[in-house]
Amino acid sequence: MFMGWVVAGSLAAQEAPDPWAFVERYQGTITRAEFDDRLHRLFDPFGGLRSSLQYSENAVTFQPAGTETPLFRLEFAPDVASSKVAPRSWRTPEEIRRAEPVEGRPLAGLRVVLDPGHIGGEWGRIEQRSTLYPGFGRVQEGDLNLITAALLKTRLEALGAEVFPTRTTAEPTTSVRPEDLLDEALAELREKRPDFFRMRPGETAESRDRRVRNRVRYEAEFVLFRRAEILARSAKVRAAFQPDLTVVLFFNASPRSIDGRTTPENRNTFFVHGSYLREEALWPRQQPRLFYKLLDRATPTEFEVARSIATVFREKTGLEPVRYGDSATTRRIEPGYDDVVARNIAANREHDGPVVVVEPYFMNHPSVLRRLLAGDFDGEREFEGRMMGSIFREYAECVVEGLVRVYGR
């Protein structure tokens, strides 16, 4: 049963043949104290990897349960002064600020990837990012992110930045389609939910098969949107561009949006990378990215940029952050500061170098909904008794100002 699905494409072509080869570049670049601090405080705060790490006097070996040989051995620097310089493809804000200034172009030379989250268009409903709000209208986040990215690209380029968008249309970047992923989805479902295949009271073999097939199709679509598409975007960037920063663009929403309900709340959210859940840290697909991100040391740059953007959003919108703090899924970067937190999501995991996830506004707040449905426009219009400009331009200008404050010269 369920055998014989032909896979016309898979994720294998998008994944590195040796996902651990990068470790060699970081030999002797980090002390044990720094490694442990970054691992336990930021990247593996829930302890998923602790039993798989074996320490010697000057090195650590990573060998998860069930593997015959270690996946890598990392030698530590004896002290900070003796640490080798870690290789990186991106420049820090300080390095960019030291470059010769260009009049009227404060971001000259800055290389930015813009990744408008989700897809939109005819894919919006399939990716479950299309919501009809009674009395308002339908909102598709993938389309909103595209509008924002186009405005942001124009503004950044006018200030001298080089900008590479991961997409400019409401079509998937990947050539993979759900039909190509049925075997993989079936295998993952068998591994994670073996009970799902058991006969339920009142079921026939035919109805059980139909239930399983529907679920496998759903899982294949999930793999496409949450994994294959993100891998394709990051591969596209690696093949054509070397960014100093990647900005991932989303709009947020409260849980009430699931069934099209509005909320009186309206807040902003900003993420940097980290905070792998225990089950995420145990997943072989994600482990190489965890250690790459830890060793690449992009967190200080991510936090500096995200904090600047968050500050501008707070100034211009007056909105408070979603106060995640040290939660079941997130970790603070700085004690007592909640505007920016670390979280492991595909969009900031798969891109190399510093990645900032910008996720402002609650789409299901009535005023935000009306502004979104009004589209982009010149000047101001009245919303909820207030004169306000285009929400897309407000979003773009907040990001631009945040980047100028960090990188500008």
Task: Give residue ranges: language-model regions.
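Catalytic-site microenvironment of enzymes
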Residues: G9-R409
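Bacterial N-terminal signal peptides
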Residues: M1-G9
